[in-house]
């Protein structure tokens, strides 16, 4: 999964969730990326084969899904309720055909500022044998 040109003044306020057509959900990023430096047009690729967590400050690159605070994350409807998977391998064996959904939620709207995913997102599927 690649998010293209994400901007937000406090990236650690973001919770990012990917949901497959059958409802399987994986937390890509939560409470990661720091609050001291804004993210400005960073592109993030999430990949289980990468050993590095989302860095602080948030920068362009490939990272493993990272959830810093292991407490429950709550998304507004229509996102599904947790618990959520922690790795993309949670999608193994699930149907790939259908509508995939990406939810990005600012879990601290009092933190100041809003963000934007400026150039959309891409999903790359690798079949398991």
Annotate each PLM feature:
Residues 1-129:
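Loop and turn regions of beta-sandwich accessory domains that flank beta-strands and are enriched
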């Amino acid at each position: 999964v690649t998010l293209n040109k994400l901007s937000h003044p406090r990236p650690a306020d973001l919770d990012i969730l990917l949901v497959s057509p059958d409802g399987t959900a994986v937390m890509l990023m939560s409470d990661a990326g720091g609050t001291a430096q804004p993210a400005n047009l960073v592109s993030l690729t999430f990949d289980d084969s990468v050993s590095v967590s989302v860095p602080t400050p948030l920068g362009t690159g490939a990272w493993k899904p990272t959830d810093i605070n292991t407490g429950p994350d709550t998304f507004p409807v229509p996102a599904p309720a947790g618990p959520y998977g922690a790795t993309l391998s949670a999608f193994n064996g699930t149907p790939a055909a259908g509508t995939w959904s990406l939810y990005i939620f600012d879990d601290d709207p009092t933190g100041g500022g809003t963000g934007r995913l400026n150039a959309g997102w891409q999903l790359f599927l690798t079949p398991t044998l």
